[in-house]
């Protein structure tokens, strides 16, 4: 009986140890597992992390396209680790590693060979290898003493084998060519692998005990066990200065390890960083070059992750956004990531729950993130409350003996008991309170006067009779010195959007039932509805979300743009509704849905309906709509989300460009870039815009080029069922090799006029060039597509630059539906006049202007027609993949 009790106690201790080690990994070294990780190398650097919404899904940011496009957005991970050109994570369901990116030594996906049924506690990645710690194995010796051993599986360069160690290990951390871990029994360090370049194994301080360790490129740093929590480092990269820091002393920066106690530590290539225990700020030491940015001061971090030459950390607070420092990576990353791993077990001693009620990263009931407790206070402060399971310790200033400005200002702003202290407090605060009251009264007066003037203005406008509106001139244009100019006041009155009531639209859409849904987006649903007059419409309803500001901005953007723009191939806005917290937009109904449904839907017959003539016609019509936005709206409009699901098809198979929620007004000079954070859809997103945050009309040209490849091939922009998941990376090599037949959609027979499709392929390849300035403008793209369509339709005059309007625009497309609705409105219905329209041209004007003048695109087309196909394709030679940030040059020059 006692034997069974002894075994039960040992099993309970073992389970507790496993749970503790699974949540204690608070920082990601060069190859440790955490909720955030960094991949590096010549292909570009990438930061990845688990989303802050508690979904355990991965989000990435950086310049390595293989990792960005290969990110498995549908898989849930326990933790992440990164190496040279690849990223790996531990799957939540199978507890097996899964990798993506590009590595010559590790198989992407689940690494092979993989033992059937094997489950892992944690994984760690080095430069070219990956190791995983299996769940503990418990055995029995002959003398009946229970022993624990560890089984570690490794894959990659000189590491593909199974290791069995006669001790229980945890906290795996990988260097460039080696791996280390902590012994659960005596807290000593154990390492294995190649130590020729690092000497890490021979230099292990065997008599020392550690709380945690982190391996760098060629060194290891660990936090010593005990109250002091000092850091100790060993290895070759922190001893031989000449081999690391360059030849000139002016290029060297050597920082010694800190003396303060640390909470966490991470290792880079030739340096290390840690989180200070008393204020959670970051500190770094080791070898740097003078171009490296230092660690930020005055801010705290939940977690750190190190790459080769830079470090990123998750800020404390509610934003959970990462910031980076060092060399070769942006300082700010537009993501929100989890500062740790969500667990549903109580926090172990020495840790506390992350308190963030406003935006909790853990969505499951009873789950939380555990963080280490702070054990000391900064100088001049004392501990007011100790660390508990629910919150960290609280430190306050000792106001009786202030020796710093921060202490004085903090103490002066808080009221204390006693008459003397109160008098001192009011003597400091009375001038501030007086100024605040005076400013508040001034602000109230300004707001009151402004409100009174606004109400007076609206009342005066309401008194204007309807006869005054009817007495305006019939023409929206007047002559000025022989030049035609638009009358903006008249255009403002004619460009109007009908105001619907919510009750009216709810009845039209049959109560917004799920059966009425005809489309869904990230922030809205589209319902089919029938108005009282029998008109079929599409009602776009914003989804209730916590991010109300973003939904409101997209609603306002689309309403303002579509109420001002008018073109045959832009989706027409009929009206809107904004009441009771609901935001709805009413459009004309597109009977045939989106181009995406035709090309990629499950119904094969629907795909076959779009023969080559219809596909190219849709491409021409979409191009004319985008050309109108770029060249005939003033200021230009940049759509930012051109894709097949935003190209809608009406009952006559005419195309309309839709969804202007992400659109922006561009500069009058279309060549000038806008500094904007990337927004759009992966696969269609301009790489130059994604990396440099420079937005121009050429970003829409890139997206349209991807759309052309999608129309020609029938493949999705990103389809991970293929080895080359990105359509651009797949199609461009085929075009360069002249293998056009392999590019075309196999569902359709090749047309007799194959030269027309070769023209379109050439246009698409030019549109997806890496640099925006090398791409053609939309007017040149439209001209080339119109000629290709004329040739495809068997037009005997292949030199005709412009197709007849009825071919391109559609025979019955005259904007009658929207005006018919306006004419049936009663006097009691609300109509809001939108702001002044931009100066624009009728849609047919673009064709006439391009026909009347020989543009650069026309001259280029005429010259290309006399060349052979192989010469034309050879001229398209250029790299499509993202540019390397220059790590190889940095290594060669500095190390």
Swiss-Prot record:
Question: Which is an annotated GO molecular function term of this record?
Answer: protein serine/threonine kinase activity
Q: How is it modified after translation?
A: Autophosphorylated and phosphorylated by ALE2.
Q: Which residues are glycosylated?
A: 158, 196, 290, 398, 410
Q: Which GO terms describe its biological process?
A: embryo development ending in seed dormancy; flower morphogenesis; lateral root formation; positive regulation of DNA endoreduplication; regulation of asymmetric cell division; root cap development; root development; sepal giant cell differentiation
What is the protein's given name?
Answer: Serine/threonine-protein kinase-like protein ACR4
TNFR-Cys repeat residue numbers: 346-395
Keyword Transmembrane (UniProt): yes
Which reaction does this enzyme catalyse, per its entry?
Answer: L-seryl-[protein] + ATP = O-phospho-L-seryl-[protein] + ADP + H(+); L-threonyl-[protein] + ATP = O-phospho-L-threonyl-[protein] + ADP + H(+)
Q: Would you indicate the residue range of the signal peptide? A: 1-29
> What does this protein's UniProt record list under function?
Controls formative cell division in meristems, including root tips and lateral root initiation zones of the pericycle, in response to CLE40 signal. Acts with CLE40p peptide as a ligand-receptor pair in a signal transduction pathway, coordinating movement of the root tip and organization of cell divisions in the root meristem. Required during embryogenesis and development, probably for the differentiation of protoderm and epidermal cells. Involved in the regulation of cellular organization during the development of sepal margins and ovule integument outgrowth and promotes giant cell formation.
Which residues are exposed on the Cytoplasmic face of the membrane? 456-895
Q: Where in the cell is it found?
A: Cell membrane; Endosome, Multivesicular body membrane
**Effect recorded for residue 540 to L/M/W:** Loss of kinase activity
